[in-house]
Amino acid sequence: GCGWGPIALTLALASRHATVHALDVNERALDLTRRNAAALGLERVTATTADGIPDDVRFDLIWSNPPIRVGKAVLHDLLRTWLPRLAPGGVAYLVVQKNLGSDSLQRWIESELGMPCGRFASSKGFRVLEVRTP
């Protein structure tokens, strides 16, 4: 989830015209993100649960540190829900620990979702996977 909002807030500060959706299942985390966005004057940040995003919304960019430890079935369901919602030409960046299956996740995205997926960056045991719309 978005936690207190570091990724969402950084993206909103860097992209002054973008609408940023920060998702979490934890209401405390969502409240912290909302408060931090308000303190920074970021009215374009929406902190909500996944149910708060209308089905017709498409994303140009997704940044995520997906919850790998929830298990493959839950993780795969999550990715099946959100990655296909990338707009044409959209891209997703997924931060995954190498020792928690970044390579197998990359192969799964390519084979199961049919989406091009490659390593965007790698450092200190983490990989950033880049997923593009086909």
Where are these regions (language model features)?
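Short "lid" loop at the C-terminus of a central beta-strand within the Rossmann-like core
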Residues: I68-V70, Q97-S102
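A short glycine-rich, Lys/Arg-flanked "PGG" loop and its adjoining helix->strand segment in the class I
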Residues: H76-P88
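Conserved beta-strand signature within the Rossmann-like core of class I S-adenosyl-L-methionine
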Residues: G89-V96
